[in-house]
C-alpha cells in the first residue's frame, strides 16, 4: 500500500491511498451545505485549465444536482463577456433604462423619487440561479468573482461557493466577497496547530507539515 499526498483522484489504483482533500470530497461537502440551506438552483463554473477534467469527473461521481455547468476561459476579457451572458447582464441593464424611461413618461405619483432610486441601481430584474460554485484558485478565482460583482450579482443575492481556500487568507479579507463559502478544516483547530508548531519549531508551518 502506498500513501500519496496528492489531492487528485488516482483511477484504477487499489493500492494507493490519496491523503489530500480532493475535488470529489469537497463537492460532497458542498452538497450537504446545499441541502441544509435549501439551495436548489446552482450553477458550476469550471475554468478551461489543466484540472478541468478532474472537476468534471468529480461532479459526475458525486451526482450533485446543478442547474448547469459552464466552462469559462481564464482570459479576463473573455471571462467578463461569458459572465455577462451567464448573468443576463445586458438584459437586466436594459431593463433599468426602460423602466426609468417609462416612469419619466408616466403620471405616477412620486415618480421622481422612484426614478432617483432606480438611478442608484445598475440593473433591474431577477437572476435565474441562487448559488454559484467556482472551481478556481488565487487571482483567477478573484477575477471570476470580480466579474460577478461587475454584473451586479453580489454574495448578498446568491451564494458564492468555491473549493478549499483555507490557506489563502486574502479571500477572507475581501469584504466585497463576503459571505464566501468553501469546504475547510476546523479553523480553531488549525490556529491551535499553528501556535503549537511555532512553539516547538520557532517557525510557521507549511501545508505539508499540516
Describe the residue ranges of each PLM region:
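Extracellular/periplasmic periplasmic-binding protein-like sensory domains
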Residues: 64-66, 84-93, 103-106, 110-111, ...
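Stable alpha-helical elements in mature extracytoplasmic
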Residues: 26, 30, 51-58, 75, ...
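Structural motif
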Residues: 5, 20-22, 45-50, 71-74, ...
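Short beta-strand elements in bilobed, periplasmic/extracellular small-molecule ligand-binding domains
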Residues: 12-16, 44, 62-108
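Extracytoplasmic ligand/sensor domains, especially the bilobed periplasmic-binding protein
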Residues: 1-45, 49-65, 69
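Short, charged, surface-exposed secondary-structure boundary motifs
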Residues: 10-16, 29, 78-79, 169-173, ...
Amino acid at each position: 500500500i502506498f500513501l500519496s499526498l496528492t489531492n487528485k483522484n488516482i483511477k484504477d489504483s487499489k493500492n494507493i491511498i490519496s491523503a489530500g482533500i480532493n475535488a470529489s470530497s469537497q463537492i460532497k461537502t458542498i452538497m450537504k451545505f446545499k441541502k441544509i440551506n435549501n439551495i436548489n438552483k446552482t450553477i458550476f463554473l469550471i475554468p478551461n485549465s489543466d484540472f478541468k477534467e478532474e472537476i468534471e469527473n468529480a461532479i459526475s461521481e458525486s451526482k450533485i444536482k446543478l442547474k448547469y455547468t459552464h466552462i469559462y476561459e481564464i482570459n479576463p476579457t473573455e471571462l467578463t463577456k461569458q459572465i455577462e451572458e451567464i448573468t443576463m447582464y445586458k438584459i437586466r441593464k436594459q431593463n433599468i433604462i426602460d423602466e426609468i424611461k417609462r416612469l419619466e413618461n408616466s403620471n405616477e405619483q412620486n415618480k421622481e423619487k422612484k426614478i432617483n432610486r432606480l438611478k442608484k441601481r445598475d440593473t433591474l430584474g431577477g437572476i435565474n440561479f441562487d448559488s454559484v460554485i467556482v472551481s478556481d484558485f488565487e487571482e483567477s478565482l478573484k477575477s471570476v468573482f470580480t466579474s460577478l460583482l461587475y454584473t451586479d450579482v453580489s454574495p448578498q443575492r446568491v451564494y458564492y461557493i468555491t473549493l478549499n481556500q483555507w490557506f489563502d487568507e486574502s479571500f477572507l479579507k475581501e469584504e466585497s466577497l463576503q459571505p464566501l463559502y468553501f469546504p475547510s478544516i476546523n479553523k480553531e483547530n488549525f490556529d491551535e496547530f499553528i501556535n503549537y508548531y511555532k512553539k516547538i519549531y520557532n517557525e510557521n508551518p507549511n501545508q505539508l507539515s499540516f
